[in-house]
Amino acid sequence: SLLAQSDPEFRMVFLIGRSLPDLWRDRLAAAIAPLEGARLVALPTLPHYMAIKRAYAMATPETASHVTGFRLDDDDAIDRDHIARMRATVAALLPVAGLEAPLVTGSNRGFFLERKPEGNALFEVVEKTPIGLGLAMTTRVGVSENIFRRNHRFCGQYYNTYTDANTPAFIRTVHADNDSDPHASGKIERADWDSAAPLIAQHFPFDAAMLQRL
């Protein structure tokens, strides 16, 4: 989904441990090679938040006054216009929210793709509290906080927070290897594949048939 963004002007750090075998590091490097602004960074063992802060610093342009960073796991997807919409939203809201205060932006509406041996299931979701997938924080350069600082569900308690409830903006993959509880905080309904297919094709760089086979 990163390669399909309508706005390609962004930087992405792929953070790995130095113990990752060369075979898999080379495979990852080849996979991200077509992505402009991508950078593969291997760090020694560190507390998670410290490693994230280092990665953010490496991706920040020297001339920037503010930086916007967002969360994305390797088994999830964002819609084609995520970067463009995030940029426009931040440009509109930051002057109102204040240039010095962190601003959190994201999306509430999307899909959960549940992988099952008997056949994958699709659920349409409208979250009540912010989902981490694609959630972004904008701060002044040099501010130590980023979007990983707090539990994403509680962002509205700590930061000015805006989430879009209209656009299908994410697909979260639910499977046995998830390291967090993949539950929805709000509305969740089983989706019919045929009915969901047009929305998936409109907003994402793959089709419903591919998701069924995944």
Task: List PLM regions with ranges.
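Active-site-proximal specificity loops/subdomain of glycosyltransferases
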Residues: 17-71
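Short, aromatic/basic amphipathic alpha-helical patches
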Residues: 24-34, 121, 184-191
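C-terminal catalytic/acceptor-binding lobe
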Residues: 128-214
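Hydrophobic/aromatic residues located in beta-strands of well-ordered beta-sheets
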Residues: 12-14
